[in-house]
């Protein structure tokens, strides 16, 4: 990351990982002021980890916050395209740029057919229920404009796990954010195993459904004004 974007600071969020990530990060952070480590006690969920990173970026006064997985699935070579999308050739730019597996030029390597099918289905499910203006609603490789993140009530976020990805896009849409996507090729992790399990997946679908009902009710109120008395 630092070789690709030398001017960037890097925050590693470690939930007491047993593989020594925390110690590795502390050792390198002591020698490089661009690297920072946030240690949390135990597994608190993907959503809370990203929120912690967002809060850190806002507190530090950064213009943008970029989130990516640290398991070799997201290649740093895609970062410049995400940053470029925030400027949009001198125009207003986008408020969130998504590293997308599902736009032309994007893709996935190393997944079995059923996982492809599940991912496509969840993305369609989220787009329909939440009205999200993007093809990849569940990917974690994203760049956000902190000016727009400040508009969000992060304390109101319900998702602690993987459905956070869809929920924050829904909140950003409601806040008037401009969305963009740039193609990436996602590689299945080279080490370790995915932490998602059936219970987590069902919980994510339920949270997205509840948000979808709320989204429909808000839309209905706009379409059908309250009757006068």
Regions picked out by a protein language model, each given a short descriptive name:
Residues 34, 38-59, 64, 76-162, ...:
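Acceptor/aglycone-binding surface of glycosyltransferases and processive sugar-polymer synthases
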Residues 14-23, 72:
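A conserved acidic beta->alpha catalytic loop
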Residues 9-11, 36, 180:
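A structural signal for isolated positions on well-ordered beta-strands in alpha/beta enzyme cores
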Residues 21-35, 64:
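Conserved N-terminal glycine/acidic-rich loop preference
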Residues 1-9:
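Short, acidic, metal-binding catalytic loop of nucleotide-sugar glycosyltransferases
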Residues 3, 131, 155-229:
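Hydrophobic helical membrane-anchoring modules
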């Amino acid at each position: 990351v630092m070789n690709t974007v030398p001017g960037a600071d890097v925050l590693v969020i470690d939930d007491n990982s047993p593989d020594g990530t925390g110690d590795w990060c502390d050792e390198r952070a002591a020698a490089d002021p661009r690297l920072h480590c946030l240690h949390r006690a135990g597994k608190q969920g993907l959503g809370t980890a990203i929120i912690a990173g967002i809060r850190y970026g806002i507190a530090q006064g950064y213009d943008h916050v970029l989130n990516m997985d640290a398991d070799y699935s997201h290649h740093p070579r895609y970062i410049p395209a995400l940053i470029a999308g925030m400027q949009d050739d001198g125009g207003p730019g986008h408020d969130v740029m998504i590293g997308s597996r599902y736009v032309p030029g994007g893709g996935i390597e190393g997944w079995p057919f059923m996982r492809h099918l599940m991912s496509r289905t969840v993305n369609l499910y989220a787009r329909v229920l939440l009205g999200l203006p993007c093809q990849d609603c569940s990917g974690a490789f994203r760049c956000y404009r902190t000016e727009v993140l400040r508009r969000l009530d992060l304390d109101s976020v319900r998702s602690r796990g993987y459905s956070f990805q869809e929920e924050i896009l829904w909140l950003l849409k409601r806040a008037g954010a401009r969305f963009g996507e740039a193609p990436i090729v996602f590689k299945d992790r080279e080490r370790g195993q995915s932490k998602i399990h059936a219970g987590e997946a069902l919980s994510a679908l339920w949270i997205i459904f509840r948000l979808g009902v709320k989204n429909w009710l808000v839309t209905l109120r706009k379409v059908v004004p309250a009757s006068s008395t």
